[in-house]
Curated annotation (Swiss-Prot):
HAMAP family: Pantothen_kinase_3. Its EC number is 2.7.1.33. The active site is at D114 (proton acceptor). The keyword Chaperone does not apply. It comes from the Bacteria. Its cofactor is NH4(+); K(+). A monovalent cation. Ammonium or potassium. Coiled coil: none annotated. Signal peptide: none annotated. ATP binds at E15, I16, G17, N18, S19, S20, T21, S22, T138. This is Type III pantothenate kinase.
Length: 266
């Protein structure tokens, strides 16, 4: 099956994250439209309708949809709306699908849909690589596959926003800071700067050190020399810009992975 083959049939991919949701219209492997909304607006079918109806108005030929979600309440509302609004297939990304990699996990039903889609995108978009896949958002996930496309394991940790929120909520006087506005230096000269820099450097340098260790594991234990580091998620461009190592950043990697899984399961 040539899953990369172009087609005239339009596909709606709904990527539901903890903070934001992306509605992406694909024709083949080309994204025609992207709309982002806050996930907390999608808790009801009416909320979904208000967000998605402009997309259907602009693309009346939409027939099929795939939903990739880490928020059950929003997923239920979106799927309910789509079943009543389109004539084609509505597919939900989960571990019951046919996957392009071997998933070794204690309980595959707990493996997040976003992680499934990201790993699928790695496997179906590239060949002859081992992969270290990062999704840097509200939480940060690391997933690792060898060049035989066997899932080796991963890590889940707080993202920048959660680290900032935790410092604020679990101390008496520390403010809630926005790390995206930090002026990068080594040391801060105010409480806000000290917090921003502490969060950013702790997260970035710690993450890069973990990646270095994973690369060594892949090289010496799995005998993989061609290793591709990829990243997606809202904070990926900022965080990876501070890396000393090369990293491929793809904003729509999870959406593309969901699209590829839809084709892979036809």
């Amino acid at each position: 099956m040539d899953i990369s083959a172009s087609t005239d049939r339009l596909l709606l991919v709904v990527e539901i994250g903890n903070s934001s949701t992306s509605f992406v219209v694909f024709q083949g492997d080309q994204s025609l439209a992207l709309q982002k909304v806050a996930t907390n607006l999608l808790t009801t079918v009416d909320g979904v309708a208000a967000s998605v109806e402009p997309i259907f108005a602009a693309h009346p030929m939409l027939v099929d949809a795939v939903v990739c979600s880490v928020v059950p309440q929003a997923e239920e509302a979106v799927v309910t709306y789509l079943h009543g609004s389109i004539t084609g297939k509505v597919m939900q990304v989960n571990s019951a699908l046919k996957l392009p990699f071997t998933l070794a996990y204690e309980d595959v039903t707990t493996f997040g849909a976003d992680r499934l889609a990201l790993c699928a995108w790695c496997c179906l978009s590239h060949t002859a690589y081992a992969f270290i896949a990062l999704d840097i958002g509200t939480a940060c996930t690391i997933d690792v596959l060898n060049s035989k496309l066997h899932y080796l394991g991963g890590m889940i940790m707080p993202g920048l926003e959660l680290m900032a929120r935790s410092l604020h909520e679990h101390t008496a006087r520390l403010p809630l800071v926005d790390v995206s506005t930090v002026s990068l230096s080594l040391l801060g000269n105010s409480t806000t700067e000290c917090m921003q820099l502490g969060i950013v450097w702790n997260f970035t340098l710690g993450l890069e050190k973990m990646i270095e260790s994973i690369k060594m594991y892949l090289e010496y234990e799995e005998h993989d020399r061609e290793i591709l580091l990829v990243a997606t998620g809202g904070a990926a461009p900022f965080v990876t810009s501070l890396f000393t190592m090369q990293c491929q950043v793809e904003e729509l990697a999870v959406a593309h992975g969901a699209r590829l899984l839809f084709s892979y399961n036809q």
